[in-house]
Amino acid sequence: GTILVSANGDGLDINGSVTMTGGTLIVQGPTANNNGALDYDGTFTMTGGFIVAAGSAGMAQSPGASSTIKSIALRFSAVQPAGAIVHIQTAGGEEIVTFKSEKSFQSLVVSSPKLQSGVTYDVYTGSTATGANQMGLYPAGAYSGGTKSTTTTVSTGATGR
């Protein structure tokens, strides 16, 4: 299934450990640094599924190192405005995700079966996307413009607070 969270406080708030085996989780928000898009106290193990979680950077977390699904955890140098589009692709141009946030954000976590260890990914911002916007995602759309803001590799994850 699919879960869409539009959060003013913590997005996914678990007072313990998390295991995700499938499905899609999209978190839009929070914007205040005392909350996180993903907030858990134990471990977060991801063995299936897809996550896009955009929110504040103050308490940002991502799935942990024991996950078989890899993650990219981005922290932007400046807050991105509501409506900003972020596009992530391989150096060879294979799309990982094109995402449009409904709220301002400074951190973005993407967890996807498409991500692999040892691969460098290009991150673009300030762009446009065409096609159907499905809960912030453009699964069959086209991306254009924008500026490459950084390159990154998969993260080892964060383990609870």
Predicted segment positions?
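A composition-driven surface/loop motif
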Residues: 1-161
